[in-house]
């Protein structure tokens, strides 16, 4: 847990950015893509460690109800001593674990079979993510080099968009365009009202 040296940085202004929930929108976006539309959310948040930036909410918890009946939870923030970064999906036939620290996905089947796959098709990109995940993510650092894993992820996204536009291929990026933002907006409302909020479509 580190206090940020530049408290005037625009990204710390929740009125401009929406706050931590919108900074970490990618995991919520991934849940929408993997599990389907979310119909309701209950959320709570607090500033546990970054008291020098009082508008910051460094711990956020969301309870999610999906339209298909699935229940989910999402916890995120920057005030944790023991960092975790991953996703678990529990289903009828086993458990899928995405671990961003190890850059891997593990499939645990009911019959005891276990399969592991890397997140990237390139060893160097997986290694880059593993190394990057060990430390504090640095932002607003002038001339800081982009991590290889992040560059590769951006390249994959761009290639997907190009193929969608030039070849008509269905892109995962086009399937959930605004869902995560809509859920995040509902979560913000829930934090204020302390009530479950239906997600507007």
Stretches found by the model and what they are:
Residues 27-31, 155-162, 184:
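A general structural signal for well-ordered alpha-helical segments in protein cores
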Residues 66, 93-175:
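C-terminal glycine/acidic-rich active-site capping loop/insertion
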Residues 1-53, 194:
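Predominantly a Rossmann-like dinucleotide-binding segment in NAD(P)-dependent oxidoreductases
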Residues 57, 62-69, 89-91:
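Active-site beta-strand termini and strand-to-loop segments that position acidic
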Residues 178-191:
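C-terminal hydrophobic helical "lid"/dimerization subdomain
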Residues 73-76, 98-100:
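Beta-strand scaffold of nucleotide-dependent catalytic cores
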Residues 25, 75-83:
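Glycine-rich phosphate/pyrophosphate-binding beta-alpha loops
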